[in-house]
Amino acid sequence: VMPARTRLLMCQTIKGRPRTCSSGLGQVSVNGRMRSPRPAAKIIAFIYIAFRNKDNSKMLQHLFVRFLLLPLSLLYGFGVSIHRFLYLTEIIKPLKFSLPILSIGNLSVGGSGKTPHVEYLVHYLKNYVQVGVLSRGYNRKSTGFIWVEPYLKSDEAGDEPLQIKSKFPDVSVAVCESRVSGVSEMVAINPALQVILLDDAFQHRAIKPELDIILTTFQQPFYSDYLLPFGRLREWRNAYKRADVLIVSKCPERLTEEIRQDYLSKINPLPHQKVYFSSFKYGNPYHLFNPEIKWFPHQLPSVLLVTAIASVQYLEDYLKPRTSSLVHQVHEDHHYFTHYE
């Protein structure tokens, strides 16, 4: 039953006489004849009813805000196009170093799983060559070039570089806002380095890498996304053509060949490009205050999940069927936890 206020909005007047309205959205009774309400009245009624539902209200508010951001996306896209033009015409020329540089990045903002893939490459390469990792050190409070050491705090080195260093103590890890300055410093101080991984550097075109790797998530592939701030893309979709390798990350464990082919057809890779599909394999959880107590994934008790990452859906989907109760405390990406927290 439509609220009275909505019914009144659908009523019009003919020569001073009020029409009578039905309580539904479908038709309006006018002088005994049934007529469809005007499009504007339908829209008003739909919006009113939708906003009465909390879930629909949130969805509509989100869509409304996004459409308000559309002009900003066009303006942002204009800036991206100028930046691209400067490099395509070689008005700005990228620098190529003598040692191999591998760039790992993405087209969208956060949540694609770059850091685990960087760690995977470090784990593999360190057995064959002297490998180094250079990151901007997102959200750190320090500036300039810094060698990352395990005793540093996250606000000094950035949480992700610190995580990489803690897992691979023998690997050279550094942070610097300028990738050119950072690589130059690393090579000058440690000439034994044979390859450097640039974390999140696809948009930093001042360096010409030996290999450009980009990630896109299975749930939110770049080909169905839009430019910031309307969408999550940092560049136009066709920027993927600069990459040598594309990785579809966070895939389901059982990925059929039919789904693979569907994604490949939509990505439409160039002849020289390689496309891979990856998924995460989580380790067994252990007790926070007693690490010797471990659980197998199918034996989890009630869980309090505390996260400060860009995308939580993949982790939630993994944990929900493996625990009797999941309470999730969500913080923004790279959140600094206080002593109280």
What is each PLM-predicted segment?
Residues 85-150, 253:
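Walker A (P-loop) phosphate-binding motif
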Residues 130-134, 214, 302-306:
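Conserved beta-strand elements of the Class I
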Residues 53-100:
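A transmembrane-helix-recognition feature enriched in membrane-embedded lipid enzymes
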Residues 55-58, 221-341:
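C-terminal accessory "lid"/substrate-recognition subdomains
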Residues 41-42:
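Short, small-residue-biased leader/transition segments that mark boundaries at the very start
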Residues 138-269:
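Phosphate/Mg2+-binding loops and adjacent switch elements
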Residues 3-23, 29-38:
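Low-acidity, Ser/Thr- and Arg-rich intrinsically disordered low-complexity segments
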Residues 75, 115, 164, 199, ...:
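Residue-level signal for inorganic ion chemistry
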